[in-house]
């Protein structure tokens, strides 16, 4: 029987990062993910991401009827593969609005203001061909 120091449930972005950090620190980690590996080309070619929607690599959640959408039920696809939503989002990265982070800070979440998280965003972003913040 294998023994692990940590069991992480969910192989989305956060689960994979936490697992990597723990393994790098010499810990034995079991990472559990409901879906398959992210080895389909449709995850890695931006224009083809729609080919993974409704497959074993996504959960297709539905909202309740939305009054602001004329009573329609909206489909909210979520990742069910290693990498989670980051693997099924057309390879798009968008920072949140600065005001949202500042609101979290103002509500008592110390360290979550935009100026606090901006250095972390910059550390995660690596595109040498573009410039600017």
Predicted regions mapped to residue ranges:
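N-terminal redox-cofactor-binding region of secreted/periplasmic oxidoreductases
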Residues: 1-133
């Amino acid at each position: 029987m294998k023994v692990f120091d940590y069991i992480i449930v969910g192989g989305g972005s956060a689960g994979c990062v936490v697992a990597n950090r723990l393994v790098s620190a010499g810990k034995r980690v079991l990472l559990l993910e409901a879906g398959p590996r992210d080895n389909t080309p449709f995850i890695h070619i931006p224009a083809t991401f729609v080919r993974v929607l409704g497959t074993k690599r996504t959960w297709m959640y539905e909202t309740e009827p939305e009054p602001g959408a004329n009573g329609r039920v909206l489909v909210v696809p979520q990742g069910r593969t290693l990498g989670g939503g980051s693997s099924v989002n057309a390879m798009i990265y968008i920072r949140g609005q600065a005001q949202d982070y500042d609101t979290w800070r103002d509500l008592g979440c110390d360290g979550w203001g935009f100026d606090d998280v901006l250095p972390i965003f910059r550390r995660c972003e690596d595109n040498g061909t573009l410039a600017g913040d």
